[in-house]
A protein has these predicted regions:
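Long, charged/polar, soluble alpha-helical segments
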Residues: 1-130
Length: 130
């Protein structure tokens, strides 16, 4: 049971950082946004690590469908999608549906990594222009 509490605590921390990211986006504060996204990714990785320790090799994540059409999504809509997935994961945790929570967190990670990748690309392009 202690593992479930740790997972839920990490998941809540991830959601809090994601909310901070959305607020930074609304304020058009790119530095805070990038920093908050980094914290989201770090907390989400920790959450997924805790899930993986709980489940070990019991599941086949390759069956979890990720959205392949993430080429040109806006940052805001991508963050909202990740937020919805993480809020749903939190509800699953409350209902003791750990596998469903794990799946949603795993898919949310895909969206967060997409945002990070886009930020890195913009930063590289800005450096090339200088």
């Amino acid at each position: 049971m202690a593992a479930n509490k740790k997972i839920l605590k990490a998941l809540k921390s991830t959601i809090t950082h994601l909310e901070n990211s959305i607020h930074a986006l609304n304020r058009k504060d790119e530095n805070s946004l990038a920093e908050s996204i980094w914290h989201v990714a770090a907390e989400l990785e920790y959450t997924l690590f805790l899930f993986s320790v709980t489940f070990q090799d019991e599941i086949d994540k390759s069956k979890w469908k990720l959205n392949p059409k993430l080429k040109k999504l806006e940052v805001g809509s991508t963050l909202v999608t990740a937020q919805d997935l993480l809020n749903e994961a939190e509800k699953y945790m409350s209902n003791k549906k750990l596998l469903d929570a794990y799946k949603n967190a795993y898919i949310a990670r895909h969206y967060i990594l997409k945002v990070q990748k886009d930020f890195a690309k913009k930063k590289r392009e800005a450096l090339k222009k200088k």
